[in-house]
Curated annotation (Swiss-Prot):
Location of the protein in the cell: Cytoplasm
Gene this chain is encoded by: rlmN
Cofactor: [4Fe-4S] cluster
Source species: Streptococcus pyogenes serotype M18 (strain MGAS8232)
Disulfide bonds: C104-C340
Lineage: Bacteria, Bacillati, Bacillota, Bacilli, Lactobacillales
Keyword S-adenosyl-L-methionine annotated: yes
One Pfam family named in its UniProt record: RlmN_N
Cited SUPFAM superfamilies: Radical SAM enzymes
Record: active site: E91 (proton acceptor), C340 (s-methylcysteine intermediate)
Swiss-Prot/TrEMBL GO biological process terms: rRNA base methylation; tRNA methylation
UniProt name for this protein: Probable dual-specificity RNA methyltransferase RlmN
Amino acid sequence: MKPSIYSLTRDELIAWAVERGQKQFRATQIWDWLYKKRVQSFEEMTNISKDFVPILNDSFCVNPLKQRVVQESADGTVKYLFELPDGMLIETVLMRQHYGHSVCVTTQVGCNIGCTFCASGLIKKQRDLNSGEITAQIMLVQKYFDDRKQGERVSHVVVMGIGEPFDNYKNVMCFLRVINDDNGLAIGARHITVSTSGLAHKIRDFANEGVQVNLAVSLHAPNNDLRSSIMRVNRSFPLEKLFSAIEYYIEKTNRRVTFEYIMLNEVNDSIKQAQELADLTKTIRKLSYVNLIPYNPVSEHDQYSRSPKERVLAFYDVLKKNGVNCVVRQEHGTDIDAACGQLRSKTMKKDREKVTATK
């Protein structure tokens, strides 16, 4: 199985071409064809030597993904189900925001973090995506825009799809460098957010990278007992370790951290828990932000339900009175398989039923 050429940063592409007797400008031409003209095959690169095109074809594919399902919401949200070369399925979501077009990408096939409310973890991690497979998600959404010929572009990226990004650290960092490259897609670092469930040692590594990419932490509980019961990762990285890493990140980068907090009815949404959350974030208040997220119910996790609006607002009021920067997240795609992992799970179930029916 040939790797995608999207797996290479521009410097890596230059080094690869030079090793094969090409001038540096040849790699720059290839890069422009990929990310500015956004061709889907090497044969479309008309200023590349005909002798070199077969070498490219022997070494790489361009886009390794195949589109399986597309769902479009009334609010303009688009959910894609892509098939990888090995037949595995991943999800990508396009969200139309007032500030631009944001794409949520997947970094792993399945997830081992084990959050008890999440559709992503219904299927255990089968493998990491390589950086080319992550970049390809952006490229296919951008192709959707290019085909419409309305001058639209992917302006923001959130690494919050299926999988734990920091459990696939090397490939995610390569992906970030590719999409941020000023000579390519040029998606600004401050328009990119990486979300982690709380791998404290990787938060420290990320702080040391010197990138301007935003960091979000999936918190979802204000104390260790509750967080360990709904997020298995907390048993390895309890709040003390997590917040030590977050404080290091803030000190090192002087950048704000966003805390994601899914509102689960009568689980983590009481007034007492709101005060606990305010107290937990007190020392980093100036450089932190809490995002309260309405829960998208998952049939396999029917022990959880969405917090009623009045409980969300009461929780929000406690945070605001304590000086916490917070917002209730606007919902997208509520009329399609909105929860991360739902579309993939449903499609895999249908595929299994088809196989069973033909036996």
